[in-house]
């Protein structure tokens, strides 16, 4: 990790909150359970592989395949665009959409959050880590919110395909509103979006899961308020960053907790998206220092993030983020990095394939069918374990290399693909 990014508002804010928050307790690996969404039998879509792209608004785009992008830390917040009431600066948002489209990405998720200083009810609110003062406050007049949403959706109808009212609404760095206020913002956005662009998807605010107190205080109450308004979202969303020392196992525990919270609230079954993720972010507290996750481990964890998502019924993950090295996160995603190579390889393995299911708790085996041919991806949650190779003829690694299978067994840890 070398260069901190001034525009990386999201992770700065999470890091600040993490220093004082309490982490949700981790748990040992568990056998797969029936998820809220069962993706067995479905075709893996390119959109599973979502990405945040630093400087997307200025023409930067990843050198690996990307199926969807989330507009956050792209100078496209409400406060960045509507700089004064009814005065809009669309240049950065136009640029972000144009860059994505020019690179073949038509699936764009925009975060509508970030109250402008002229509209906020709390000028002293955390304001996205102090970069945009007042942006964490609620609108003094919800009619200003209504107008903002209508302006965006009207301008980008058919080009921005999904909207998320807020980012990490359970953290005061991003929102000082109550669950009821956030539910009201969600409902108003939903009604406007559907009236202007019925085909657009409305995604629930991406709730942070790793800080137990803010999650438990906010999210069940938000679901209750949302239910009272008729559940006005098309997709549930979370940010399942684990504590800095956490692994993909702990990330999956947080995802299950989030999923189970919907079940406890009687929330309807809707698609699940993880709209922001990485590992190694400092906190909570001094016993969880930031981590650099490099080499094979970075490749392994990046791939497992998406494979675990499929197992959990999560149909989309937006990695944070593509760009120059960012000191706040543990896994770097840029040209030639192990994580970038791994995601390129994994997409080649599974995009367009039918997901047939996974078995195992510690040694995990998932099967896919693509072009009439079956493949098996196997890895371990921890350590290494033997795997019988009878019937398999080729083994491929996340770095894209393949070789013939020799012998009756192999030892696996990182995900590998076996074919017959």
Predicted regions: what is each one?
Residues 278-348, 357-362:
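Aromatic/acidic polysaccharide-binding cleft in carbohydrate-active enzymes
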